[in-house]
Amino acid sequence: MEKISIQLSKLRKNFGTVEVLKDVDIAIPEGQFVALVGESGCGKSTLLRLISHLERPTSGQLLIDGKERRKINPSVRYLFQEARLLPWRSVLDNVRLGAKDRDKKTARESLESVNLLDKENEWPEILSGGQCQRVSLARALAGKPKILLLDEPLGALDALTRVQMQKLIESLWLEQKFTVLLVTHDVSEAVYLADRVIALEKGQIGLDREIPLPRPRVKDRHFACFENEILNFIMKNYYI
């Protein structure tokens, strides 16, 4: 039987009188890569914040590894669109913040996994945007997470760096077998990376599609079919 990593049942989230998430039901097996897509304001980032316990649900049930938790779970790590590195700490010391007991060996191994060990003694300000995000990823992975939450971490990167980061994230996921939830506005990115794409619509699940394409993925006609189906769903209200 598949072990369920994340279980959401009738999950709701209100901000004042505004209902952002409405009766969301999702079961995510351990090790699955899930992408969340949809219009701005549909509840994608709010859902990640609930799973990370940065926010509390208004009602419903949220289980991580079969348990209902009230505090931030150290086995869940969050990567934001901004790298959020401390400018007064070296690259290595930034990564150590994510490691248990700030262990230097673990931090160096994590930096090596993102191909930045040679930058361990540098300051964040001299790094490129892509390098900063790789350091942020290394910091998250230094905590040996079971669940990695990615909130548009590639959105501000140039096209080439974005492709490189996609390949890096995929290779680390395949190697380390953690569960991933990726929020992205890029449907092509979602289909390229995810086992499963969930489209939110006005705070509810509108589409939940498995992507059974072999890896490494090629952007052929089969890829395009999934991409077009998801895009058509998201854009259906804009068609005249």
Curated annotation (Swiss-Prot):
Q: List the InterPro entries hit by this protein, alphabetically.
A: AAA+_ATPase, ABC_transporter-like_ATP-bd, ABC_transporter-like_CS, ABC_transporter_ATP-bind, P-loop_NTPase
Between which residues do disulfide bridges form?
A: none
- Alphabetical list of Pfam families matching this protein: ABC_tran
An annotated GO cellular component of this protein is:
plasma membrane
Q: How does it sit in the membrane?
A: Peripheral membrane protein
All copies of domain ABC transporter, residue ranges: 6-227
Reaction catalyzed:
ATP + H2O + aliphatic sulfonate-[sulfonate-binding protein]Side 1 = ADP + phosphate + aliphatic sulfonateSide 2 + [sulfonate-binding protein]Side 1
Q: Where in the cell is it found?
A: Cell inner membrane
Q: What class of enzyme is it?
A: translocase
Molecular function GO labels: ATP binding; ATP hydrolysis activity
EC number in record: 7.6.2.14
Q: Which domain of life is it from?
A: Bacteria
Q: Which residues hold ATP?
A: 38-45
* UniProt KW keywords: ATP-binding, Cell inner membrane, Cell membrane, Membrane, Nucleotide-binding, Translocase, Transport
Q: Which PROSITE patterns match?
A: ABC_TRANSPORTER_1, ABC_TRANSPORTER_2, SSUB
Q: Is the ATP-binding keyword given for this protein?
A: yes
What is this protein's function per UniProt? Part of the ABC transporter complex SsuABC involved in aliphatic sulfonates import. Responsible for energy coupling to the transport system.
Q: How is the subunit organization of this protein annotated in UniProt? A: The complex is composed of two ATP-binding proteins (SsuB), two transmembrane proteins (SsuC) and a solute-binding protein (SsuA).
**The family this protein is said to belong to:** Belongs to the ABC transporter superfamily. Aliphatic sulfonates importer (TC 3.A.1.17.2) family.
Q: What name has this protein been given in UniProt?
A: Aliphatic sulfonates import ATP-binding protein SsuB
This chain's source organism reads: Zymomonas mobilis subsp. mobilis (strain ATCC 31821 / ZM4 / CP4)
Gene that encodes it: ssuB
